[in-house]
Amino acid sequence: MDLLTVDKSKCLKCGICVECCPSCILSMTEEGPTCEFDRGCMACGHCVAICPVGALENKYTPLDKQRPVTKPMLDEETAYEFMRMRRSVRNFKPVMPSEEDLTKLLNITRYAPTAGNSQGMYYLVIRDAERIKAIADAVANWMEEEIEAGSPNKRYYMTVLRAYRDRGQDIIARKAPCLVFALARRLNNTGVSNAEQCWAYAELFAPTIGLGTTIA
C-alpha cells in the first residue's frame, strides 16, 4: 500500500500538506501531493489533519481512525486557570489507585509531544510497599555515593539524607502507594526529554480523575 492515497475529485492542490510536513518528504504534482521517501514519514498525521477538504489518506493515520473533537474547546480563561492550578502532591493518601485510573493516566501520555513523533515510551508500575521502600533506600545510597564523590548537588543530597535517615521522613518516595517509571530504549537519545513531556501531560490530567502526582 502506498503511503498516500489522494482523492483527486476533492484535492484542491493547495499545497498546505506539503508545507506542513515536518519530514519534508511531500511534493505537489499535477495529480496532487506525492511522497518522495515513504520511510521518512514519522506518522504524525499532520498532512491528513491539515487538509481542508479531507482529500488525503496516510496509511499510518487513516481518516476512518480519526476521532473528532465532540466537546467544546476550553476558552482562554478556563484553559489559563486549568494550567495555573497545576501543583505537585507530596502527601499521599494510603489508597491504591485503581488499575482503570492508572490506565487512563498512562493512556493520556500517548498524546504528549515527542521528538520526531518517536514516542517509544514504556511504563513500569510498582505497587508493592516493600519494593517502593527498597527503591527509596537505593536512591538514598546513591545520594551518599554522590556526596562522597564531590557532586555539585551534595548540599541538596545531604539535606535529603538528614530528613530520610535521621528524622525518618520519607522525603524520597513520599509514602506514595504507587510508583510509575517512564522507560525508553537505551538507543533512544531523546528518551529523557520525551519522558518529561509525557509526565507533564500525566500531571495535568491526574486531578481530573482524582489522583495526585509528583515527578522525580
List where the protein language model places each region.
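Specificity-determining recognition surfaces
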Residues: 19, 68-104
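Ferredoxin-type iron-sulfur electron-transfer modules and their immediate structural context
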Residues: 1-20, 24-27, 73, 77, ...
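Short gly/pro-enriched beta-turn/loop segments at secondary-structure junctions
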Residues: 118-119, 173-177, 208-209
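Iron-sulfur cluster-binding cysteine motifs and their immediate structural context
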Residues: 3, 16-32, 46-63
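Glycine/small-residue-rich phosphate/adenosyl-binding loop
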Residues: 124-195
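N-terminal, charged amphipathic alpha-helical interaction modules
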Residues: 111, 115-122, 128-131
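Short microdomains enriched in Cys/His and/or Lys/Arg
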Residues: 35-50, 66-84
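Small-aliphatic-rich amphipathic alpha-helix that forms the alpha element of a beta-alpha
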Residues: 12, 86, 105, 109, ...
